[in-house]
Amino acid sequence: MKKLLCICMIMMSCISAFGQASVSNVAIPEPEFNGDAFICNLSANTYVKAEKAIGQMKTKDQFWGPERKLYVKPSKSSVRVKKGHIQFIIRVPNINDDPYSFIKISKFSAGSTRKLSLARQNELSGKVTYGGKNKQELFFEAKKYGASSLLIDADIEKPGEYCIMISNPNRVDGKIPVSCFGIDE
């Protein structure tokens, strides 16, 4: 009986050691909270957390119709990366939802604050355009990463201030959390 117990203990310690080794093989962990984003380099196993900011949404009545804009202070992000191919790991509420329906990568219009045109409605035609007249939204590709995150690939060539926004239809106030970063030459 003691031999059987000893063999079981050895097997359990081996399984435990193997389980810990497989967890440590994960190069880049998933972000902790929904909406958090890591800017990562998977080939070098490095990452940096994107700046988390709370944007204030305001609606302005323009000549051509109402326009919703998102304002974020300060005017520049503290997180800077080089232009080119960029990968993000973003934690999402439901990994099985279509990422193109609720994730937006957008370029800010930078001045004293960072601002982003969310939607504009034309009074005459009733047409609603998203991303503003200068097409601030960027194309990306998405894949599942881990248990509750997505790996986002985007090619960003223009220097400036950018954000990743996860839309939440249940939000009732005018504050929107965004993950911000800046692109340098």
Go through each PLM region and give its residues:
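Positively charged n-region of N-terminal signal peptides that target proteins for export
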Residues: 1-4, 19-20
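Sec-dependent N-terminal signal peptides
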Residues: 4-13
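Primarily secretory-pathway and cell-envelope proteins
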Residues: 20-126, 168-185
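Extended, solvent-exposed segments with strong compositional bias
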Residues: 119-147
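Exposed aromatic-hydrophobic patches
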Residues: 149-155
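A glycine-anchored, Pro-Gly-centered beta-turn/N-cap motif
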Residues: 155-165
